[in-house]
A protein has these predicted regions:
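Structural motif
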Residues: 34-37, 101, 159
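Hydrophobic, regular-secondary-structure patches
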Residues: 1-59, 82-87
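Hydrophobic secondary-structure segments that place a key small or acidic residue at a functional site
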Residues: 42-45, 58-64, 77-149
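Residues that scaffold the ATP/ADP-binding catalytic core of kinase and kinase-like folds
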Residues: 70-71, 100-101, 154
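Cytochrome P450 core scaffold surrounding the K-helix E-X-X-R motif
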Residues: 67-75
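Mechanotransmission and gating elements of multispan inner-membrane complexes involved in transport
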Residues: 115-191
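Short amphipathic alpha-helical segments
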Residues: 1, 89, 160-164
Length: 191
């Protein structure tokens, strides 16, 4: 994406408690703004990704599969299996992480993360739907993608979101310091 919307401070340390409580208000504004070509709502958390053979720390992204296709290259990076369909407990994993965990498509993965507001640990079981390769070791070794609803459930955050990623009609808009979409938002401090 060419731009991000999140609560002020979130990008500095990815604090799961700094999330947009009602992203639908922002999404309505984005839908009405002709400068915005597409956007995708995400939740994101650090966590443990485990298989029967190994565990690694990494980032868990909960994404809206349809929206994400318009703002990122995840679907194009799939090298085995399939992209997310929206079915419960699907997971995309990088080829490097899949090697570390000794998993392939169809195998089970346990995700462990901290719930928002309580920091209580939570776990859920997922199946590897697809394996991606971006060609960037950090991305391929440290990130998994799950469906947005599963991410919200895992983190116990209902309709919330950590980030909205933007794609603009004109890429130059991403450098426009006068992009005032988010001004006058009295309820949340956005950046």
């Amino acid at each position: 994406g060419e731009g991000h919307i999140n609560l002020k401070g979130f990008r500095q340390n990815l604090d799961v408690d700094l999330y947009l409580k009602n992203p639908s208000t922002i999404m309505g504004k984005l839908n009405d703004d002709e400068r915005v070509a597409a956007f995708s709502v995400r939740v994101l958390s650090g966590g443990m990704i485990g298989s029967p053979y190994n565990s690694v720390g990494g980032l868990i992204y909960g994404v809206n599969a349809e929206q994400e296709k318009k703002v990122s290259k995840i679907k194009d990076a799939i090298v085995a299996g399939d992209y997310l369909t929206g079915e419960k407990r699907e997971l995309l994993i990088g080829d490097e992480m899949a090697d570390l965990l000794e998993v392939k498509t169809g195998d089970r993965i346990v995700l462990t993360a901290a719930k928002v507001n309580s920091n209580e640990l939570t776990q859920d079981l997922f199946r590897v739907k697809g394996i991606f390769e971006f060609g960037n070791r950090e991305l391929d070794e440290e990130i998994v993608f799950i469906n947005l609803a599963d991410g919200q459930a895992l983190l116990d955050m209902k309709e919330g979101a950590h980030q909205i990623v933007l794609q603009f009609q004109n890429e130059a808009t991403s450098r426009d310091n006068d992009f005032v979409l988010l001004e006058n938002n009295p309820t949340q401090d956005l950046e």
